[in-house]
Amino acid sequence: QKVMDNYEKMLECYASDVKDPKLPEVYAGIKSFCHNLVHHLLMYQVIQNDSFFRSASDSSKNLDLMQIGERIEKGDIDEDFLNLAFSYILTVRQWNGKKLSYFADIVCNPATDYRAAALMISAAMLSSIKVFDYNMMTTLFDIWKKSKDVKISERALVGWSVIMMSVDSEQYPYI
């Protein structure tokens, strides 16, 4: 409801030619909400229509990024955990800036097991290829710049590049 109220106020400002200093902020909020909503709906559709994504989503329903980070910090990594982490990241709905930053911190942390970091990058890349996520794509670019581990940096750059090549430029002209 708040988004609709903001939208109505924005239209009133445009119609009456009022120069509200908060208008760009309101517009950015509406735009962000709409992008997030579209991403959620597209990912939901993929999960419903693709058996691999449905299985991945079902298997990782009880997991979140904080749990992944905590287990990686403890070094509590086994094949089952890596499969769950991959499934979670593959089917996650769009993250906010705080979660994306946490994701990048986990991946770039020198103490993070290489297998876990590489797997997280691969899952993010595959997810963003299936349902484009601009924020995840730019996060992979940031990981490329930020990581001190050459292999992680290269993997993030490859992920970013593959996402860039898979983007429909007509649907996303700002890319």
List each model region and its residues.
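Terminal low-complexity "docking" segments
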Residues: 1, 16, 158, 174-175
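Extended, helix-rich scaffolding/adaptor regions
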Residues: 1-77
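Long, charge-dense low-complexity segments
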Residues: 12, 16, 34, 141, ...
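Alpha-helical solenoid scaffolds in large eukaryotic transport, assembly, and signaling factors
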Residues: 67-146, 159-171
